[in-house]
Swiss-Prot record:
Residues 947-975 are perinuclear space. As a component of the LINC (LInker of Nucleoskeleton and Cytoskeleton) complex involved in the connection between the nuclear lamina and the cytoskeleton. The nucleocytoplasmic interactions established by the LINC complex play an important role in the transmission of mechanical forces across the nuclear envelope and in nuclear movement and positioning. Probable anchoring protein which tethers the nucleus to the cytoskeleton by binding PLEC which can associate with the intermediate filament system. This is Nesprin-3. Belongs to the nesprin family. The keyword Nucleus applies. The lineage of its organism: Eukaryota, Metazoa, Chordata, Craniata, Vertebrata. It comes from Homo sapiens (Human).
């Protein structure tokens, strides 16, 4: 009876299982998201159809359930568990199938939707890309003016901002593409597609950025040009107002003030011309980036400004000529009065400036540098006042000349007298302040000596007291006192050593005699200190040896070893180069302190030797410690010597640099004052004062070369930062010197113009000018009837007066030539292993060649003074050395072009191919023309006395002296 329900149940179960297996097989076939979009859509439709079969499967499962209910109702109890188990499996299989259908379809549908959204976003991005490319493709349109260019720039910046904003969308698209590629693996979203999208975006961004940069440059150029135009128009407006204020008959200003105003305006014209030329140069670039109408407007604006400037210049020239005519029509008396008043006013300003800058009461100086600064300031003021002495004499002479005229000059004479009295009082005050500063410096420098005297008394007393100390407590009492006295001795030694290094400063302040006496006193005190210091060290060693008797070797050796290691570390730390003079002085002080500590350590080591007690191990340790200590002492002595030499060189350099700077400043102020008060009326007095100032130039020029050489030595012994500072100081000094020489040349040209004006006025004499005008005299008058004996007397006076100048110039030139020659020798000795070395050597040779005109100028000054005194052997020696140096420098330049990297350069290089025959032929070719030339010169020298009887034989004998010099010369010939 149960067989039919059982068969129906089995049939329904098999049918349901077969259907579910078929569905799962179809799902497994379509369960894949890889591949192109069409395949994905096909799988999506298949899974959707499979999902639509779910009711059919549910019907089959329900049928199984009904069959199971019927079977369970009629089957025996022992079969029910099996039926229920099969029923449970069918339900579980059905749930799994339904879940698989849903998940498979949902996954494929989600990927398809994701892909669709990505395609929409990508299409939107490419629409934006095409739109942006169309916008950025056309060339930049030329605009009319600055405002339009700024608008165009703003629009380009907006486009660039839009491009920057699209970066977020692009990053999102790239992320989605990478995610899709991981799921579908389609080539449309692979890495190449992503890179293409990124490259296209970068191209658009670069194009937008390039457009913005170009428009920014165009706008910036136009802004700079417009700012220059506005500034020039303001200047032009101000000049027009000034010129209008000086024009017309109704102008209330005095003629001199109007003429001065016009001269000031004339000084501004070159600046205006330069500004206009600069604007015209800038306009070329602006016009290229401007529309034709805007370019026409710019060109018209420039032409209008040019016309206004030319019209203004013509108006100024016409008015200045008219005012000069009026000014020349005034009387000579009024001209002299005004000149005297102007010079008096200038003199008052100079006195006021000197009183304010150099004679104001300064704060109480606390340090040595402040005291030296005060003394230098007072000395510079005193020198400046002394240099104004010729001006005082000139004021008195001009006042005497004006007194003969029948006019009331009492106010003017009172002003002159009051100014001269003020000048005298300032001289007295400056001398008093300078002497007071020198006294303070003397007391400051004497203070270490006084402290040393007190220390000597204390040290002698300690030596007397510690002569015999029987008990141990006394040793512990006096040993720290001796150590303190030794520390004070080291401090005093540092102070006295620094004082000895300031020899140039002491000589400059106190003079040679007092400075020498002070340095001798310091040296004697140093010797006394050294004796007492050594005595204290011996006494300390003795006391320590007494204390050491109560210790063992290990307790005494370990502190000595630690102290030696500490000294070695500190000495190693002091081997670096310092930046400036205070750093070098501090380093020297530290090294001297280390020396004192080394002496103390040596005394302690000697005190510890009795503890060895013939122990070989202890003896070996002690010997090793002594060896290390001696090596440290030698290294420390070398360091101290080098540091002391470096400090001394730096002190000398700083002192001479400061002196030369002060001289340049004072001389520049004097020359500026002469240029400001210069006029053709007092040309002779101005010329005399100018020659007096210029006479110091050769000596200072030689001093400049020495300072530069000392500066290079200081740079070699300084740190890179310090060398840069010294190099900057030398550069500033050279610029100041060049500015001073330019000022000298301008004044020289001005005085020449005065002589030309006087020559035009004086038609009774015929002046002869040459291009080679010496600085000591500007006019050569062949018709001057000076008797021969008077001329000889003048020459003798000039010879006596210039003897000291000649000797000083001779020494300066010799020192300068020695420094330059040593530099050349070092350059020749260089080994050019690389092309960089060759370029370095070439640059150094070019620097030496650039200073040859400077040496030639110094040598010409020597020759100018030499013939008046007769040619000396020293001058002939210097002449030969100078000729030899120039020849060696020239040959070094030629050999530089023939040498290759890695070979010895200069005169070290030999030429093996040069044979004896070639050398002989070259010597003959050179010697024969020289012999003919020498014979011709001898003939001319013999004929000179026949042509001019009153000619001195000095010049004729110069050539014979050169033969004498060559006979005495034993060195190699010049190359």
């Amino acid at each position: 009876m149960t067989q039919q329900p059982q068969d129906d149940f089995d049939r329904s179960v098999e049918d349901a299982q077969a259907w579910m297996k078929a569905v799962q097989d179809q799902l497994q076939v379509n369960d894949n998201t890889q591949g192109p979009r069409a395949a994905l859509e096909a799988r999506l439709w298949e899974t959707e159809k499979i999902c639509q079969l779910e009711p059919e499967g549910r019907v089959r499962v329900d049928l199984v359930l009904r069959m199971a209910e019927a079977l369970l109702a009629c089957c025996p109890g022992d079969q029910k568990p099996g039926i229920l188990a099969r029923l449970k499996d069918i339900k579980a299989q059905w749930e799994e199938t339904v879940t698989y259908m849903t998940h498979c379809h949902s996954r494929i549908e989600w990927v398809w939707l994701h892909w669709s959204e990505y395609l929409l976003a990508r299409d939107e991005f490419y629409r934006w890309f095409q739109k942006m490319m169309v916008t950025l493709e056309p060339h930049i349109e030329l605009q009319l003016g600055l405002k339009e260019k700024q608008w165009q720039l703003s629009h380009a910046q907006v486009l660039l901002h839009n491009v920057d904003n699209q970066a977020v969308l692009l990053d999102r698209l790239l992320e989605e593409a990478a995610s899709l590629f991981n799921r579908i693996g389609d080539p449309s979203v692979d890495e190449d597609a992503q890179k293409r999208m990124k490259a296209e975006y970068d191209a658009v961004k670069a194009k937008a950025q390039k457009r913005v940069d170009l428009l920014e440059q165009v706008a910036r150029e136009h802004e700079e040009y417009q700012a220059g135009v506005d500034e020039f128009q303001l200047w032009l407006k101000a000049v027009v107002e000034k010129v209008n204020g000086c024009l017309g008959r109704n102008c209330k200003l005095p003629i001199t003030q109007r003429l001065s105003t016009l001269q000031d305006i004339a000084k501004d014209f070159p600046r205006g011309e330069e500004s206009l030329e600069t604007l015209e140069e800038q306009s070329a670039g602006v016009i290229r980036n401007t529309s034709p109408l805007g370019a026409e407007k710019i060109t018209g604006e420039l032409e209008e400004m040019r016309k206004v400037l030319e019209k203004l210049r013509a108006l100024w020239e016409e008015e200045e000529e008219r005012l000069r005519g009026l000014l020349r029509s005034r009387g000579a008396w009024e001209q002299q009065i005004k000149q005297l008043e102007a010079e008096l006013s200038e003199f008052r300003m100079v006195l006021q400036r000197l009183a304010q800058e150099g004679l104001q009461p300064a704060a109480k100086a606390g340090t040595e540098d402040e005291l030296v600064a005060h003394w230098r300031r007072y000395s510079a003021t005193r020198a400046a006042l002394a240099s104004e002495e010729p001006r005082v004499d000139r004021l008195q002479a001009q006042l005497k000349e004006l007194i003969v005229f029948p006019h009331n000059l009492k106010p003017l004479s009172d002003s002159v007298i009051a100014t001269i009295q003020e000048y005298q009082s300032l001289k007295v005050k400056s001398a008093r302040l300078r002497n007071a500063a020198a006294v303070e410096l003397w007391q400051h420098f004497q203070r270490p000596l006084q402290d040393l005297q007190l220390w000597k008394a204390l040290a002698q007393r300690l030596l007397e007291v510690t002569a015999s100390l029987p008990d141990l407590p006394s040793l512990h009492t006096f040993l720290p006192q001796i150590e303190a006295a030794l520390m004070e001795s080291s401090r005093l030694k540092e102070l006295l050593t620094m004082l000895q290094l300031k020899k140039d400063l002491l000589i400059g302040i106190f003079g040679q005699e007092r400075a020498t006496a002070l340095l001798e006193q310091v040296a004697g005190s140093m010797r006394d200190r050294d004796l007492l210091h050594n005595s204290l060290l011996q006494r300390k060693s003795k006391l320590q040896s007494l204390l050491a008797q109560h210790k063992d070797f290990g307790a005494a050796f370990e502190p000595l070893q630690r102290k030696l290691l500490d000294l070695q570390v500190r000495v190693q730390a002091e081997k670096g180069l310092q930046r400036d003079l205070p750093g070098k002085q501090a380093q020297l002080s530290r090294l001297q302190g280390l020396q004192e500590e080394g002496l103390d350590l040596g005394a302690q080591m000697e005190a510890a030797r009795p503890l060895v007690q013939e122990n070989p191990n202890h003896q070996h340790k002690m010997d090793q410690l002594s060896s290390d200590f001696q090596a440290l002492q030698r290294s420390l002595e070398d360091l101290v010597d080098r540091c002391r030499q470096s400090v001394q060189e730096h002190c000398t350099f700083s002192h001479q640099l400061l002196e030369l700077r002060q001289w340049i400043v004072v001389t520049t102020q004097k020359l500026e004052a002469h240029r400001g008060e210069a006029g053709p009326g007092d040309a002779e007095s101005q010329e005399a004062e100018f020659e007096r100032l210029v006479a110091e130039f050769p000596e200072k020029e030689a001093q400049l070369s020495l300072v530069e050489a000392q500066g290079w030595l200081v740079m070699e012994k300084s740190s890179p930062e310090g060398a840069a500072v010294v190099q900057e100081e030398l550069r500033e000094l050279a610029e100041s010197w060049r500015a001073l020489r330019l000022l000298e040349e301008s004044l020289l040209s001005l005085i020449r113009n005065w002589h030309l004006q006087r020559m035009e006025v004086d038609s009774g004499k015929k002046m002869v000018f040459t291009n080679n005008i010496p600085k000591s005299g500007f006019l050569i008058n062949p018709m001057d009837p000076i008797p021969r004996h008077r001329r000889r007397a003048n020459l003798l006076q000039e010879e006596e007066g210039s003897h000291e100048d000649f000797s000083q110039l001779l020494r300066n030139f010799g020192q300068w030539l020695q420094v330059e020659n040593s530099k050349l020798v070092r350059i020749i000795a260089m080994r050019t292993s690389t092309a960089e070395d060759l370029r370095t050597r070439k640059s150094k040779l070019q620097e030496l060649e650039a200073r040859v005109p400077e040496g030639q100028h110094l040598f010409e000054n020597l020759l100018r003074l030499g013939p008046a005194r007769g040619t000396s052997d020293e001058l002939e020696d210097l002449r030969y050395q100078w000729m030899l140096y120039k020849s060696k420098l020239k040959d070094s330049g030629h050999l530089l072009t023939q040498s290759s990297p890695g070979e010895p350069t200069g005169f070290q290089k030999t030429r093996r191919w040069r044979g004896l025959g070639s050398l002989f032929r070259r010597a003959c070719c050179v010697a024969l023309p020289l012999q003919l030339l020498l014979l011709l010169f001898l003939l001319l020298l013999f004929l000179l006395p026949i042509r001019e009887e009153d000619r001195s034989c000095t010049l004729a004998n110069n050539f014979a002296r050169s033969f004498t010099l060559m006979l005495r010369y034993n060195g190699p010939p010049p190359t």
